[in-house]
């Protein structure tokens, strides 16, 4: 087996070899020479080189000797080549003990140690270590390592001592030369920290090969960076070799964009945070609700709903759409109302006891039932109510109750145009919270809104005069339901003016009973202005309060609950509605006669009492005309509009196949034509 001699040298310490220490590495078959390198290179240390332990393993008769620089024979003083590709070749000489060297003058030459009698090169081993030269000032940040492989045949030769001495002396010389002229290149040098305090090499003077205690240290290599700080570091060259395996070097050319721009990534969230939610109203309530689609499937889908202080309810397909402010739909609450299926509003659910005639502001009306009992028309019925008012349970009662339970968490928003949005919450507490928030916002938005269209902005002077004429009608100086002055809101189908507080209650009734509009905020086409100018508060109250004797209307000091109870009893329950005139005609036939005579007051009374079937009654089998046909034949847009609001069929044809639009064209009434086309009457001229 072979033997290994390993030496680690630091320029600032002396070199000594301890006697008979080492480790065997039979796989190594070449000489490694390592030059100085700087720590900044960061190359990993080779596994074969262990700087913390300097070993010498030789044969039994082999001894190591050290020669001081002062004692170095003149025959050993040589200079290294300045060529970076230079190598040191050691060859054995079996014929002579003298070590002779012959450095070439050519820069491409190498330092050659060869024997006197043998000229052929038996074996060449070149080092494959990279020289890393620091660009900073040198301050003892490098070391040099050399490993000498000794096989059995070499260890038995007597000239081995001179070979080891030459190699040992060559190590610091190479370090000195390399640092001095920056020309010696030792590729792929593995840099490591120096951990050996001193290394001693002893030499026996007698040549017998015995070791003694005479030792000295090799002088430290001077720091060339301090001597010549202005030198430039040339790029080092790599010496290829098939023996040693190079370490893989990774390029920084293809670094990820994410890692190459840390500042941009750090600043990106700050810039993004500055733009979130800019220009949008802050929601006062928001969350996920189920919304029923308007298609025939009637499917429920999750929507992210927001309620803002500007009086707008907005729903999005998802929370992400809300964050991006896309795919949204808005509901203007100023022209809408909210309803809960199967439930009265909370303001109208107070109990009502039997009210005597002495009650100044009662809403119940004493009616003869044949038993002398009084009926309370409040949602809750007193315990003193006659048993006649408690009908036997219906066989469908349980079914209706079950249907109500299924929709306990639902609520709907109805616009002035009749459009409906159905929403559902997860719990009834959440539903009530949404209903209360929307109701409060409707009232707040109506109270805080200012007129966006002044009288000077009207399209013509005639429109301003028409709106002024509406306010100048009898009874329109105060609210139709109680004595609030200067009302600014109107109910189209009732033809009345009201205050803003009553307008909120009228919205809760639904568009079937009251269609609320603002005199200042909404547009007023000709047909609507004519309806309002034809009815007024006095005419309307003569019909809707025709039987309110003994009942006192709410005052300005009345609570909202009292006002709402009065309004619902007046329009929804029709407790104070004037009675029908005594006639042998049915209500439908009476309506046809009133329409033909253009008796507006009688027509309004009949419409208030009538049902949808009675409103659509025809003159007879031979004619087949409805009240709408008669109104359009007269060109009376007020009656035509009222009939449409109360449920007349605009698609109906008479016995001759004519629609109401045909009669409107015959009467040359453009106003009736516009109304009929607006509500979907078929146009046969198209």
UniProtKB/Swiss-Prot annotation:
Keywords: ANK repeat, GTPase activation, Metal-binding, Repeat, Zinc, Zinc-finger. The keyword Cell membrane does not apply. Signal peptide: none annotated. The lineage of its organism: Eukaryota, Metazoa, Chordata, Craniata, Vertebrata. This is Arf-GAP with GTPase, ANK repeat and PH domain-containing protein 5. Pfam families: Ank_2, ArfGap. It comes from Homo sapiens. Residues 282-443 form the PH domain. The gene is AGAP5. Encoded by one of the numerous copies of centaurin gamma-like genes clustered in the q11 region of chromosome 10. Belongs to the centaurin gamma-like family. SUPFAM superfamilies: Ankyrin repeat (SSF48403), ArfGap/RecO-like zinc finger (SSF57863), PH domain-like (SSF50729). Residues 226-241 have a biased composition (Polar residues). InterPro entries: Ankyrin_rpt, Ankyrin_rpt-contain_sf, Arf-GAP_GTPase_ANK_PH, ARFGAP/RecO, ArfGAP_dom, ArfGAP_dom_sf, PH-like_dom_sf, PH_domain. A zinc finger (C4-type) spans 479-502.
């Amino acid at each position: 087996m072979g033997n290994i001699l390993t030496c680690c040298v630091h320029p600032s310490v002396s070199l000594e070899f301890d006697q008979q220490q080492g480790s065997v590495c039979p796989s190594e078959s070449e000489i490694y020479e390592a030059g100085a390198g700087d720590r900044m290179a960061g190359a990993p240390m080779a596994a074969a080189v262990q700087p913390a332990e300097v070993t010498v393993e030789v044969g039994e008769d082999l001894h190591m000797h050290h020669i001081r620089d002062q004692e170095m024979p003149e025959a050993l003083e040589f200079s290294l080549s300045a060529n970076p590709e230079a190598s040191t070749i050691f060859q054995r000489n079996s014929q002579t003990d003298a070590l002779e060297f012959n450095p070439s003058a050519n820069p491409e030459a190498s330092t050659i140690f060869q024997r006197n009698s043998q000229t052929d090169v038996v074996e060449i081993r070149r080092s494959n270590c990279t020289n890393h030269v620091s660009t900073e000032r040198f301050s003892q940040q490098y070391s040099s390592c050399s490993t000498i492989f000794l096989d059995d045949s070499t260890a038995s030769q007597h000239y081995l001592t001179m070979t080891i001495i030459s190699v040992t002396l060559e190590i610091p010389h190479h370090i000195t030369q390399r640092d001095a002229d920056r020309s010696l290149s030792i590729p792929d040098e593995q840099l490591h920290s120096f951990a050996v305090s001193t290394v001693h090499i002893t030499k026996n003077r007698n040549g017998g090969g015995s070791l003694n205690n005479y030792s000295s240290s090799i002088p430290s290599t001077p720091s060339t960076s301090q001597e010549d700080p202005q030198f430039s570091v040339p790029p080092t060259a790599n010496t290829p070799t098939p023996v040693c395996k190079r370490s893989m070097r990774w390029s920084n050319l293809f670094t990820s964009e994410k890692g190459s721009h840390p500042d941009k990534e750090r600043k990106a969230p700050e810039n993004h945070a500055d733009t979130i939610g800019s220009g949008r109203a802050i929601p006062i309530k928001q969350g996920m609700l189920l919304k029923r689609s308007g298609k025939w499937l009637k499917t429920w889908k999750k929507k992210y709903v927001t309620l803002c202080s500007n009086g707008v309810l907005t729903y999005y397909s998802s929370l992400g759409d809300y964050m991006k402010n896309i795919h949204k739909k808005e509901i203007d609450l100023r022209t809408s109302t909210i309803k809960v299926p199967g439930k009265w509003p909370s303001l109208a659910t107070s109990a009502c006891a039997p009210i005597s005639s002495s009650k100044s502001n009662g809403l119940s009306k004493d009616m003869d039932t044949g038993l002398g009992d009084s009926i309370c028309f409040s949602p809750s019925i007193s315990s003193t109510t006659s048993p006649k008012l408690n009908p036997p349970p219906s066989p469908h009662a349980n079914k209706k109750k079950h249907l109500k339970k299924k929709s306990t968490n639902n609520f709907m928003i109805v616009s002035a145009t009749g459009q409906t949005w159905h929403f559902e919450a997860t719990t009834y507490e959440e539903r009530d919270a949404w209903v209360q928030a929307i109701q409060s916002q409707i009232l707040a938005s109506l109270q805080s809104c200012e007129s966006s269209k002044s009288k000077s902005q009207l399209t013509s002077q005639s429109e301003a005069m028409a709106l002024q004429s509406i306010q100048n009608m009898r009874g329109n100086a105060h609210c139709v339901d109680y004595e609030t002055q200067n009302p600014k809101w109107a109910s189209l189908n009732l033809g009345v003016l009201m205050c803003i507080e009553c307008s909120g209650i009228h919205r809760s009734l639904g568009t079937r009973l009251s269609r609320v509009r603002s005199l200042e905020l909404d547009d007023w086409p000709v047909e609507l202005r004519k309806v309002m100018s034809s009815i007024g508060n006095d005419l309307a109250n003569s019909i809707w309060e025709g039987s309110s004797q003994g009942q006192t209307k709410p005052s300005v000091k009345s609570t909202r609950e009292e006002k709402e109870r009065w309004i619902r009893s007046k329009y929804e329950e029709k407790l104070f509605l004037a009675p029908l005139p005594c006639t042998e005609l049915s209500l439908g036939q009476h309506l046809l006669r009133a329409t033909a005579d253009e008796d507006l007051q009688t027509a309004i009374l009949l419409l208030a009492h009538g049902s949808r079937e009675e409103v659509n009654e025809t003159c007879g089998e031979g004619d087949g005309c409805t009240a709408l046909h008669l109104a359009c034949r007269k060109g009376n847009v007020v009656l035509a509009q009222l009939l449409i609001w109360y449920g007349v069929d605009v698609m109906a044809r008479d016995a001759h196949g004519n629609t109401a639009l045909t009669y409107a064209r015959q009467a040359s009434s453009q106003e009736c034509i516009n109304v009929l086309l607006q509500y979907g009457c078929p146009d046969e001229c198209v």
